Protein backbone atom coordinates (compact mmCIF):
# COMPACT_ATOMS: atom_id res chain seq x y z
CA UNK A 1 0.00 0.00 0.00
CA UNK A 2 1.43 3.35 -1.02
CA UNK A 3 0.17 6.50 0.67
CA UNK A 4 -0.33 9.44 -1.68
CA UNK A 5 -0.57 12.88 -0.06
CA UNK A 6 -3.60 15.05 -0.77
CA UNK A 7 -3.45 18.57 -2.15
CA UNK A 8 -6.21 21.16 -2.39
CA UNK A 9 -7.09 19.61 -5.78
CA UNK A 10 -7.07 15.94 -4.78
CA UNK A 11 -4.23 13.41 -4.71
CA UNK A 12 -0.71 14.56 -5.60
CA UNK A 13 -0.98 13.62 -9.27
CA UNK A 14 2.76 13.92 -9.93
CA UNK A 15 3.27 11.13 -7.39
CA UNK A 16 0.31 9.12 -8.72
CA UNK A 17 1.65 9.32 -12.27
CA UNK A 18 5.18 8.40 -11.12
CA UNK A 19 4.02 5.20 -9.42
CA UNK A 20 1.27 4.17 -11.84
CA UNK A 21 3.20 4.79 -15.04
CA UNK A 22 6.54 3.34 -13.91
CA UNK A 23 5.75 0.41 -11.61
CA UNK A 24 3.84 -2.56 -13.01
CA UNK A 25 3.24 -3.90 -9.48
CA UNK A 26 0.89 -0.98 -8.83
CA UNK A 27 -2.49 -2.46 -9.72
CA UNK A 28 -4.95 0.19 -8.60
CA UNK A 29 -5.82 3.31 -6.71
CA UNK A 30 -8.77 3.93 -4.42
CA UNK A 31 -10.35 7.35 -4.78
CA UNK A 32 -13.15 9.13 -2.95
CA UNK A 33 -13.35 12.01 -5.41
CA UNK A 34 -16.05 14.18 -3.84
CA UNK A 35 -15.80 15.58 -0.30
CA UNK A 36 -12.90 13.24 0.37
CA UNK A 37 -12.00 12.68 4.01
CA UNK A 38 -10.53 14.14 6.09
CA UNK A 39 -10.57 17.58 4.45
CA UNK A 40 -13.68 17.41 2.29
CA UNK A 41 -11.74 17.96 -0.93
CA UNK A 42 -13.47 17.48 -4.27
CA UNK A 43 -11.06 16.57 -7.05
CA UNK A 44 -10.46 19.41 -9.49
CA UNK A 45 -11.21 19.08 -13.20
CA UNK A 46 -7.46 18.92 -13.87
CA UNK A 47 -7.04 16.06 -11.38
CA UNK A 48 -9.88 14.06 -12.96
CA UNK A 49 -8.42 14.66 -16.43
CA UNK A 50 -4.97 13.53 -15.27
CA UNK A 51 -6.49 10.35 -13.85
CA UNK A 52 -8.22 9.77 -17.19
CA UNK A 53 -4.97 10.27 -19.09
CA UNK A 54 -2.90 7.81 -17.01
CA UNK A 55 -0.79 5.33 -18.96
CA UNK A 56 -0.37 2.54 -16.40
CA UNK A 57 2.62 0.22 -16.53
CA UNK A 58 0.28 -2.58 -15.39
CA UNK A 59 -2.30 -3.47 -18.01
CA UNK A 60 -4.70 -4.55 -15.26
CA UNK A 61 -4.44 -1.28 -13.30
CA UNK A 62 -7.83 0.15 -12.29
CA UNK A 63 -9.10 3.33 -10.66
CA UNK A 64 -11.59 2.45 -7.93
CA UNK A 65 -13.82 5.56 -8.05
CA UNK A 66 -15.79 5.40 -4.79
CA UNK A 67 -18.25 8.26 -5.13
CA UNK A 68 -19.52 7.74 -1.56
CA UNK A 69 -20.58 11.37 -1.11
CA UNK A 70 -21.99 12.04 -4.59
CA UNK A 71 -25.20 13.68 -3.26
CA UNK A 72 -24.11 14.77 0.21
CA UNK A 73 -24.48 18.51 -0.21
CA UNK A 74 -24.47 20.87 2.76
CA UNK A 75 -24.28 24.12 0.85
CA UNK A 76 -26.47 25.80 -1.72
CA UNK A 77 -23.51 25.79 -4.12
CA UNK A 78 -22.40 22.15 -4.17
CA UNK A 79 -19.08 21.07 -5.58
CA UNK A 80 -19.21 19.80 -9.14
CA UNK A 81 -17.14 16.73 -9.99
CA UNK A 82 -16.13 16.02 -13.57
CA UNK A 83 -17.37 12.66 -14.88
CA UNK A 84 -14.38 10.30 -14.85
CA UNK A 85 -15.88 7.92 -17.43
CA UNK A 86 -16.52 10.72 -19.93
CA UNK A 87 -12.92 11.88 -19.51
CA UNK A 88 -11.56 8.34 -19.82
CA UNK A 89 -13.50 7.82 -23.05
CA UNK A 90 -11.86 10.97 -24.47
CA UNK A 91 -8.40 9.51 -23.78
CA UNK A 92 -9.19 5.96 -24.88
CA UNK A 93 -8.99 4.72 -21.29
CA UNK A 94 -12.59 3.65 -20.66
CA UNK A 95 -11.36 0.46 -18.97
CA UNK A 96 -9.52 2.38 -16.23
CA UNK A 97 -12.36 3.35 -13.86
CA UNK A 98 -14.64 1.12 -11.85
CA UNK A 99 -17.17 3.47 -10.29
CA UNK A 100 -19.49 2.80 -7.42
CA UNK A 101 -21.68 4.42 -4.82
CA UNK A 102 -24.25 3.31 -2.28
CA UNK A 103 -26.94 4.50 0.05
CA UNK A 104 -24.93 3.36 3.10
CA UNK A 105 -24.30 6.93 4.22
CA UNK A 106 -27.86 7.89 3.32
CA UNK A 107 -29.93 5.15 4.95
CA UNK A 108 -28.24 2.43 7.02
CA UNK A 109 -24.47 1.87 7.24
CA UNK A 110 -23.65 -1.55 5.87
CA UNK A 111 -27.22 -2.09 4.69
CA UNK A 112 -27.47 0.30 1.80
CA UNK A 113 -28.12 -0.46 -1.83
CA UNK A 114 -25.02 -0.18 -4.00
CA UNK A 115 -24.50 0.67 -7.65
CA UNK A 116 -21.53 -0.12 -9.88
CA UNK A 117 -20.65 1.30 -13.28
CA UNK A 118 -17.77 0.41 -15.57
CA UNK A 119 -16.86 -0.25 -19.17
CA UNK A 120 -18.37 -3.27 -20.88
CA UNK A 121 -14.98 -5.03 -20.68
CA UNK A 122 -14.77 -4.50 -16.91
CA UNK A 123 -18.40 -5.49 -16.39
CA UNK A 124 -17.77 -8.75 -18.27
CA UNK A 125 -14.81 -9.58 -16.01
CA UNK A 126 -16.75 -8.64 -12.87
CA UNK A 127 -19.76 -10.72 -13.90
CA UNK A 128 -17.56 -13.76 -14.54
CA UNK A 129 -15.66 -13.32 -11.28
CA UNK A 130 -18.59 -12.64 -8.95
CA UNK A 131 -21.42 -14.53 -10.61
CA UNK A 132 -21.21 -17.45 -8.17
CA UNK A 133 -20.39 -15.56 -4.97
CA UNK A 134 -23.94 -14.97 -3.85
CA UNK A 135 -27.18 -16.89 -4.11
CA UNK A 136 -29.26 -13.75 -4.47
CA UNK A 137 -29.15 -10.09 -3.62
CA UNK A 138 -31.12 -8.78 -0.66
CA UNK A 139 -34.23 -8.01 -2.68
CA UNK A 140 -36.26 -7.12 0.41
CA UNK A 141 -33.73 -4.44 1.30
CA UNK A 142 -33.89 -3.15 -2.27
CA UNK A 143 -37.67 -3.06 -2.03
CA UNK A 144 -37.48 -1.16 1.29
CA UNK A 145 -35.29 1.47 -0.37
CA UNK A 146 -37.56 1.78 -3.41
CA UNK A 147 -40.66 2.14 -1.25
CA UNK A 148 -38.98 4.65 1.04
CA UNK A 149 -37.44 6.88 -1.64
CA UNK A 150 -39.85 6.17 -4.53
CA UNK A 151 -37.57 7.92 -7.04
CA UNK A 152 -34.48 10.12 -7.40
CA UNK A 153 -36.38 13.20 -6.19
CA UNK A 154 -37.24 11.25 -3.03
CA UNK A 155 -33.53 10.62 -2.45
CA UNK A 156 -32.78 14.34 -2.88
CA UNK A 157 -35.58 15.31 -0.48
CA UNK A 158 -34.17 12.89 2.08
CA UNK A 159 -30.72 14.43 1.62
CA UNK A 160 -32.21 17.85 2.40
CA UNK A 161 -33.10 16.43 5.84
CA UNK A 162 -29.48 15.33 6.26
CA UNK A 163 -28.37 18.82 5.26
CA UNK A 164 -30.57 20.45 7.92
CA UNK A 165 -28.98 18.26 10.59
CA UNK A 166 -25.38 18.39 9.36
CA UNK A 167 -24.94 21.95 8.08
CA UNK A 168 -25.11 23.63 11.53
CA UNK A 169 -22.47 21.20 12.80
CA UNK A 170 -20.18 21.92 9.86
CA UNK A 171 -20.75 25.67 10.32
CA UNK A 172 -19.59 25.45 13.95
CA UNK A 173 -16.43 23.58 12.99
CA UNK A 174 -15.62 25.72 9.95
CA UNK A 175 -16.29 29.11 11.57
What is the predicted role of each segment?
Residues 1-175:
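PLP-dependent class I/II
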Amino acid sequence: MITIPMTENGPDMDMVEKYVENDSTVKGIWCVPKYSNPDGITYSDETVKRFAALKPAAKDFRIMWDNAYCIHEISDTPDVLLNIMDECKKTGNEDLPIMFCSTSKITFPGSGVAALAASENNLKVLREKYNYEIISYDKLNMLRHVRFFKNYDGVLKHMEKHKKILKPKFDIVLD
